[in-house]
């Protein structure tokens, strides 16, 4: 089966784009976790990474929604930056592991960390969508 006949998620070029983006996002996340120390017992780097990633993903997908067709450069951008890059950058597994680790000694902080990450991440995603929709798109009269 040729690359053109496969569904987009099974094409080798799409898989490659996601893999490259994922490696870059994961590398960036790892570098940030090395550079940003914990804030007491709270893994602030992972919190920040997940919130920033949620904002960027909301903004990216809202911008790409304007182009309605998920083909060509729009698809490559979504796969490379969205699925790969931001998927590798953000981390639910580290959030889960950090929450369990924190719960051993500070259960209240663990609950606040987990809920705070999810709630603030959702708000950041909404803010990214809003920014793309209201601030970055040209108005209808332009």
What residue ranges belong to the model's regions?
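Membrane-interface helix-loop junctions in multi-pass transporters/channels
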Residues: 1-142
């Amino acid at each position: 089966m040729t690359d053109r006949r496969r569904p987009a998620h099974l094409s080798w070029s799409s898989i490659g784009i996601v893999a490259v983006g994922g490696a870059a996002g994961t590398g960036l996340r790892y570098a940030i976790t090395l550079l940003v120390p914990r804030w007491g017992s709270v893994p602030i780097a992972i919190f920040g990474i997940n919130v920033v990633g949620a904002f960027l993903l909301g903004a990216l997908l809202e911008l790409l929604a304007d182009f309605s067709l998920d083909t060509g450069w729009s698809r490559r951008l979504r796969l490379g930056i969205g699925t790969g890059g931001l998927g590798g950058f953000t981390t639910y597994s580290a959030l889960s592991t950090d929450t369990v680790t924190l719960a051993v000694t500070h259960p209240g902080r663990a609950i606040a960390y987990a809920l705070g990450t999810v709630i603030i991440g959702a708000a950041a995603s909404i803010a990214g969508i809003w920014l793309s929709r209201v601030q970055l798109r040209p108005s209808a009269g332009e």
